[in-house]
């Protein structure tokens, strides 16, 4: 997967984006700690920002397996797919 420049979507440079496919981008959060609902809410805001620039863009999250069930539910309800990768 190719890295995408976050500034193209008016996002801070610390946000890591990867192109998964044409019209499909992934937000990368490979951290050791668990992703909680507060983190998921921030991911939803990033996804909305990406889709405000390119409405046809599908957004997914690339993360480790440490993600809480409430976060998974929130992401699923917002149409954000989850791709599990190991650290």
Predicted regions and their residues:
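Generic preference for hydrophobic/aromatic residues in regular secondary structure cores
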Residues: 11-21, 27, 77-85
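Hydrophobic beta-strand segments of well-ordered beta-sheets in folded domains
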Residues: 23-26, 55-61
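Arginine/glycine-rich "motif VI" loop of SF2 helicases in the C-terminal RecA-like domain
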Residues: 48-56
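Short, compact, well-ordered microdomains
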Residues: 57-87
């Amino acid at each position: 997967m190719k890295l995408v420049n976050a500034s193209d979507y008016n996002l801070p440079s610390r946000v890591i984006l990867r192109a998964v496919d044409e019209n499909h981008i992934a937000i990368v959060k490979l951290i050791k700690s668990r992703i909680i609902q507060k983190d998921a809410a921030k991911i939803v805001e990033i996804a909305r920002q990406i889709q405000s620039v390119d409405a046809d863009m599908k957004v997914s999250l690339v993360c480790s397996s440490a993600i809480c069930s409430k976060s998974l539910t929130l992401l699923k309800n917002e149409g954000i797919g989850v791709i599990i990768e190991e650290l």
